[in-house]
A protein has these predicted regions:
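Hydrophobic pocket/interface hotspot
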Residues: 57-58, 65, 83, 116, ...
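Surface-exposed, charged secondary-structure patches
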Residues: 22, 82-128
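Short beta-strand edge/turn micro-motifs at domain boundaries
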Residues: 111-117, 127-165
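N-terminal alpha-helical signal peptides/signal-anchor transmembrane segments
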Residues: 35-43
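Ser/Thr/Pro/Gly-rich low-complexity linker/stalk segments immediately outside membranes or between
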Residues: 22-36
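Hydrophobic membrane-insertion alpha-helices, especially the h-region
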Residues: 4-21
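Short, solvent-exposed secondary-structure junction/capping segments
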Residues: 36, 55-74
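Signal-transducing coiled-coil linker helices
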Residues: 45-52
């Protein structure tokens, strides 16, 4: 095999690896997709399912995290653990919950830190409380890439009121 073919194969191999490897932006978007999926509730769920979802949500939050939610449902939340506890309380009272993130904008503040803004919508229904509705908020978040496992996690989250629908 001549040198030109060998160099061509090497370049093609490097390009393929770089193309198949998920970018950091894609990995951060996946964190939001996972949060949306784990927050979703489509009816009654057992304790095992609820616990698994709580554990999956906790995995998305850095060990030391802060939250500013200023919300009538999720309030007095200062840490990731408190956030998961509050979310599980709300999930226990709701029949259906859907949370989605749109218009996600990511700005990297270094190799291991990213600032993210997004629009978040929440739809819910609780027959026990006689409540149902939709809400939209703006989310400002800082995500940090863990040094041990290279996973992106929420370090700081701030929800701002935008529009009630």
């Amino acid at each position: 095999m001549d040198m030109k073919k060998l160099v061509g194969i090497a370049i093609a191999a490097v390009a393929l690896v770089l193309w198949l490897r998920p970018s950091e932006s894609k990995r951060i978007r996946k964190v939001f997709a996972t949060a949306s999926s784990e927050l979703r509730k489509d009816g009654q769920e057992g304790l095992i399912v609820a616990t698994a979802k709580a554990h999956a949500l906790a995995e998305l939050v850095a060990t030391e995290a802060s939250f500013e939610l200023d919300d009538r449902i999720l309030h007095d939340v200062g840490s990731g653990r408190q956030l998961v506890q509050q979310i599980m309380l709300v999930r226990g009272q709701a029949d259906k919950i859907e949370v989605g993130f749109t218009d996600i904008v990511i700005a990297f503040d270094g190799e291991r830190t990213a600032s993210v803004t997004a629009d978040v919508y929440v739809r819910g229904l609780s027959s026990a409380l006689g409540l149902g509705g939709r809400d939209a908020r703006e989310l400002e978040a800082v995500l940090e890439k863990d040094k041990d496992d290279d996973k992106w996690r929420f370090k700081k989250v701030r929800l701002l009121p935008v529009v009630s629908m």
